[in-house]
Each structure stands twice: as C-alpha cells, then as structure tokens.
Amino acid sequence: MQNQIFIFRTSIKNKQDIKSIKTLFTQYPTIHKWNVDLEDWEKILRIECLEITPIDVLNALQTINIYAEELE
C-alpha cells in the first residue's frame, strides 16, 4: 500500500501542543512521519501515513483538544 499524505490547518498554539500530538501519534504506528509549521498562521500539520483516514486523524486530535480541518 502506498503512503498517503494529509495536510491540516490546526489550532495548535505552542510546543506543548506538539508534545501532546507526539504522545498521541505514538498510538498510531501507521503514521510514519509528521510535522507542524508553527510559523504558518494556519499552523499546518502534515502527516505521512498508511491505512488511516483524515477522519481518524481529526477524531484523534479532538481527544487532546486540537481542532483541525483537512486542506485539499
């Protein structure tokens, strides 16, 4: 199966939010790489993964009070 790339605009505010995401994403072994651009006003989250949907990512982020919206 081929890697998928998802890009989200988020409500990430700081490095503490990024630490929370790191802890969360350790529960998802199909997420291979991810990064956040804190310099961008939309706080872009980019994820490379297998066998996970954008809805799965959105739901997971909501559990740690991070709002996200997929960009197309």
Feature-to-residue mapping (PLM):
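Short glycine-/aliphatic-rich beta-strand segments at the starts of folded cytosolic domains
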Residues: M1-I12
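Short acidic amphipathic segments
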Residues: F25, I31-D37
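Short beta-strand-to-loop capping motifs
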Residues: T10-I12, R46-E51
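Short amphipathic alpha-helix segments
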Residues: S11-Y28
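Surface-exposed aromatic
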Residues: E39-I44
